[in-house]
From Swiss-Prot:
GO terms for molecular function: flavin adenine dinucleotide binding; glutathione-disulfide reductase (NADPH) activity; trypanothione-disulfide reductase (NADPH) activity. The active site is at residue 461. Disulfide bonds join 52-57. This is Trypanothione reductase. Its EC number is 1.8.1.12. PANTHER family: GLUTATHIONE REDUCTASE (PTHR42737:SF2).
């Protein structure tokens, strides 16, 4: 016999939990949330809290924080700190254990939320669509496996997130994804991270800090410059600093196959014919919407050409009572975006307050070493959308690095504006503190701040952030898509 709910949510990630909690607490609806695992780790990895909590933002940020201490220890000598000769070494096992405990605490807090919230129920298993109003919960992902529960609902929300993409090459079974990287029993001595995106760059920094003596971190990317889609100046500077930190970056290289050596290490053959022997190959070539186990075909839910669930601006699918939010829609794969989408959906469906998520001017960060903060348009995109664009840029050595021994660690700040009216279209930062600074910048962009608002604001001294309040003269311009040092008088 079916259990009846107002809302059934498949997926207990950030967006699904936000939607379920809000529906139950704000609008007193009866809500069911389904997921395959309560606590983090193998075999399914994404448990209560979703990718972010279990195999994404949270554990990654903890591990990056740990990795930064390598430089802090080295740089402390410039500030008068001396060590008596006793060894300092990284303890990977201790890091992973501490990370696991922190993530488990969050898992348990969500368990408590379900136990303590009236009208909010959790079901363990694999949720899939039987009809447009019925969700079945099965023992496994196999659609022929035993049915544990049958849930009837007026509204169904798909929020199963995304999954690491693995390439179709021989020997891919010898490689890991970022999921497994969070649970490696030992730090790899020789590691190859494949991909030029933020996940590959972030893990390269983590592995580089914790590698055993004599270790080597290599990052390969199929194109000529990592971090496609980010500001080009920052991409170039990140490459310089990663290289200065000892990471080898192989551009225009892509693995063709991976085989095992007799000692268990991996032999990577690239499309160019080059080879590399490493202990771990981590694939980080992107993430794909996790739709394959939902049985969407049973009700005809449409997908986008890239495999995401097709939705409108209110997160509605083509089936009237079925919705989708978060990574599964392949709109903007960021945790705060999924949370906002979940809250907006519940307000729309149950609160009679139609609301949609604004996917523009969303601040985000890359927790690489050095870190990146970005919000709004990069200059190439702005130049296509606006006739006249002015770019303000500054690159400098932060005060601390004048004595830290790391003068190569430049801070880069760039402001992209519509030169016709001064509106700030994008801000891009590289260096210590960039992720923290960019959050406040995001508020400015949402308020349609102008460049004059920035330079007329008194900065906090001495900080890197004050540079945003110091740039009064454009570094260069774009006119009808063409880059130039100065604008012709006729266009002024």
């Amino acid at each position: 016999m079916s259990k009846i709910f107002d809302l059934v949510v498949i997926g207990a990630g950030s967006g699904g939990l936000e939607a379920g909690w809000n529906a139950a607490t704000l609008y007193k609806k009866r809500v069911a949330v389904i997921d395959v695992q309560t606590h983090h780790g193998p075999p399914h990895y994404a448990a209560l809290g979703g990718t972010c909590v279990n195999v994404g933002c949270v554990p990654k940020k903890l591990m990056v924080t740990g990795a930064q201490y390598m430089d802090h220890l080295r740089e402390s000598a410039g500030f008068g700190w001396e060590f008596d000769g006793s060894s300092v070494k990284a303890n990977w096992k201790k890091l992973i254990a501490a990370k696991n405990e922190a993530v488990l605490d969050i898992n348990k807090s969500y368990e408590g939320m379900f136990n303590d919230t009236e009208g909010l129920d959790f079901f363990l298993g694999w949720g899939s669509l039987e009809s447009k109003n019925v969700v079945v919960v099965r023992e496994t992902a196999d659609p022929k496996s035993a049915v544990k529960e049958r849930l009837q609902a007026d509204h169904i929300l798909l929020a199963t997130g995304s999954w690491p993409q693995m390439p179709a090459i021989p020997g891919v079974e010898h490689c890991i994804s970022s999921n497994e990287a969070f649970y490696l029993p030992e730090p790899p001595r020789r590691v190859l991270t494949v991909g030029g995106g933020f996940i590959s760059v972030e893990f390269a920094g983590i592995f580089n800090a914790y590698k055993p003596p004599g270790g080597k971190v290599t990052l390969c990317y199929r194109n000529n410059l990592i971090l496609r889609g980010f500001d080009e100046t920052i991409r170039e500077e990140v490459t310089k600093q990663l290289t200065a930190n000892g990471i080898e970056i192989m551009t225009n290289e892509n693995p063709a196959k991976v085989s095992l050596n007799t000692d268990g290490s991996k032999h990577v053959t690239f499309e160019s014919g080059k080879t590399l022997d490493v202990d771990v190959v981590m694939m980080a070539i992107g993430r794909i919407p996790r739709t394959n186990d939902l049985q969407l075909g049973n009700v005809g839910v449409k997908l986008t050409p890239k495999g995401g669930v097709q939705v409108d601006e209110f997160s509605r699918t083509n089936v009237p009572n079925i919705y989708a939010i978060g990574d599964i829609t392949d709109r903007l794969m960021l945790t705060p975006v999924a949370i906002n989408e979940g809250a907006a959906l519940v307000d729309t469906v149950f609160g009679n307050k139609p609301r949609k998520t604004d996917h523009t001017r969303v601040a985000s960060a890359v927790f690489s070493i050095p870190p990146i903060g970005t919000c709004g348009l990069i200059e190439e995109v702005a130049a296509k959308e606006f006739e006249k664009v002015a770019v303000y840029m500054s690159s400098f050595t932060p005060l601390m690095h004048n004595i830290s021994g790391s003068k190569y660690k430049k801070f880069v700040a760039k402001i992209v504006t519509n030169h016709s009216d001064g509106t700030v279209l994008g801000v891009h930062l590289l260096g210590d503190g960039a992720p923290e600074i960019i959050q406040a910048v995001g508020v400015c962009l949402r308020l349609n701040a102008k460049i004059s608002d920035f330079y007329n604001t008194i900065g906090v001294h001495p900080t890197s952030a004050e540079e945003l309040c110091s740039m009064r003269t454009p570094s260069y311009y774009y006119l009808k898509g063409e880059k130039m040092e100065t604008l012709p008088e006729s266009s002024l």
